[in-house]
């Protein structure tokens, strides 16, 4: 698995016994697979599912009931911030961790305005996701 093979470990203890569910929406098969493998190795978390399109992300959210959706802002056909708004409008919406290749203060502000709970740059995905999850679930 990616997490163990690369030596990554999340020392964050769980405050309860419940496993948190993470879903991933990303159009890149390689990134989606790597992210799924990392999530599968995270203590206290379980992979709820993956999809390669933004529109299928809504179906995944409604069917799998994740606690967190990792959403690539570039996933077609509906782009970025509009998709964050759609997901957050769903009843019982999960936390949305937006992912981007261009992690800038402007991108973070725009993602926050759209309703994203965190923004993670893909260039620092492991550290960024670990930090975002620690903030979302202290």
Task: Give residue spans per PLM region.
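Acidic, metal-coordinating helix/loop segments flanking the phosphotransfer/catalytic sites
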Residues: 52-68
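Alpha4 helix (beta4-alpha4-beta5 surface) of REC/receiver domains from two-component response regulators
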Residues: 82, 103-120, 124, 130-131
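Active-site residues of response regulator receiver
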Residues: 72-73
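Short amphipathic alpha-helix used as the core "switch/output" element in two-component signaling
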Residues: 81-92
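Non-catalytic signal-transmission and effector/linker regions of two-component phosphorelay proteins
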Residues: 1-21, 31, 128-138
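Conserved acidic segment of CheY-like receiver
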Residues: 19-30, 35-39
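Acidic catalytic/metal-coordinating carboxylates
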Residues: 53, 79-82
